[in-house]
Amino acid sequence: GGHCRRGGATAVGMGHLVAMDDNPAELALSDYSIQAWRTWAADLPEDCAYRNCGTLWLAADAAELAEAERKRQALLAAGVACEMLDAARLRDLEPVLRPGLAGALKVPGDGILYAPNAARWLLERAGPRLLRLHAEVSEVDGSRLRLADGRWLSAEALVLANGIHAGELCAELPIRPKKGHLLITDRYPGTLRHQLVELGYVSSAHASSGTSVAFNAQPRPTGQIFLGSSRQFDTLDPQVEGPVLARMLRRALDYLPGLAGLNAIRAWTGFRAATPDGLPLLGEHPAQPGLWLAVGHEGLGVTTAPGSARLLAAQLFGETPPLDPTPYLPQRFLSSSGSARP
């Protein structure tokens, strides 16, 4: 423990479970995983704070309403339940939203959970089969690793799953950190019922430079409201930046004017591990037999954890994978000679 556990994304993220459809592979992995979370829901302890609150994708105008309709068709084609809401129906469901929004797409299967406790529960479920050793790793070589104290350990397989820090052990991985700001309010039970996301979120989520903000709000089971989101490249500074937070809050107030009177109790930052195509690397390193990669989940690590784990396990043990693993294989960026593909 101690100094070697650097800012895990699990502890600082939003814990949203969202079916994202930027491409078919992202939707396949997120939808499969959300269904897995849903089957675990009955067994999750209360401290995991799982809620099947659903998401409302908000359309501010006619152009965003057209985007909502495109999204509806993509989700339905993949078997994900969803429905369009007109302006009046949206007002009924979430009266705190500003008047004048064009409508929304409701995705009832989406949810939220408190990821650190869910991760702890998953580890505990493994029971005595899992031996935990907390130590800093300074080098990996195939299925061998060297600890900071100089000892080498070897195994049949080594899985690298350390997010933005993966590049420190494997320099050729195409992972860039994307900084995000988050804020949580005091308790205001009953203010929000669904997770709210603006349809402009997608263009913010995939901007490849600069700083972008998009409105994202979540009702926590405590009655608190969780606010995001911002994205910044080319910084590793964990400090909360006033101007970015201010932009994010202005965006939130644009959608939820009533928030102006609410107390914010804490703001913090985290880093997402972004890949060039927005999909994680799940599979064996083509140049290092025995080294398996599970990195690059960007903002969907909690959502896609179950599917990612099952895809990796199926490859490791030669079983039939639940989804086509091809889109996530590291070969799309890494060559068998060990260098990054141009």
Regions found by a protein language model. Name each.
Residues 14-93, 214, 251-253:
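Dinucleotide-binding Rossmann-like beta1-alpha1 core, especially the glycine-rich loop
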Residues 28, 58-67, 106-124, 239-244, ...:
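Short beta-strand to alpha-helix junction loop
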Residues 86-87, 133-135, 266:
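Short loop/edge segments at beta-strand edges and connector loops
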Residues 105-143, 148, 153-156:
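Helical element adjacent to the flavin cofactor pocket in flavoenzyme catalytic cores
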Residues 247, 253-342:
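C-terminal catalytic lobe of FAD-dependent flavoproteins
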